[in-house]
Amino acid sequence: AGSGDDGIEIIDISTPSSPSSVGRMTDRDDRTRELDGANGVAITTIGSSTYAVVTGSNDDGVSIIDISTPSTPVIVSELEDGTDTGVCTAANGERCLDGPRDVEIETINGLTYAIVASHKDDAITIIDITNVSNPTIVATMYNSSTKELEEAKGVSIVTIGGSTYVVVGST
């Protein structure tokens, strides 16, 4: 994703020595999109469609984009941070997506989840994207004296011994 370009570029690398641009989507084309400061991108296939889940760190949101036809990506849904009280809790009406930097996708028990690291909220947010038109936040974990999530910036997922883990990098 191009953070300064506020969007995504889709590049065909079928011939690695000759990459070619085939599609793009930017926040500049439509300022209502959650692509300002696009940072993290994760790709998944649900049903017969392929989606890019993109974090917009300046828009404080996440976009789900259908890229099944790479030349014409289409926004399917978006989530934004909501009320910003400075203290990220669901009780404050926030979605804890302030400054999302990275996203990974994992399917667990038949459901597909996007795990988002938000550096300004010092949190990770787990979003059920099985129904891409209606993404639903299922859990959020915040930084605390017993957790190292301050300025969470990177996420990676691994399955070890039948359990699924997210490893979060923070500063």
Regions found by a protein language model. Name each.
Residues A1-T171:
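Feature marking well-ordered beta-strand scaffolds used for ligand recognition
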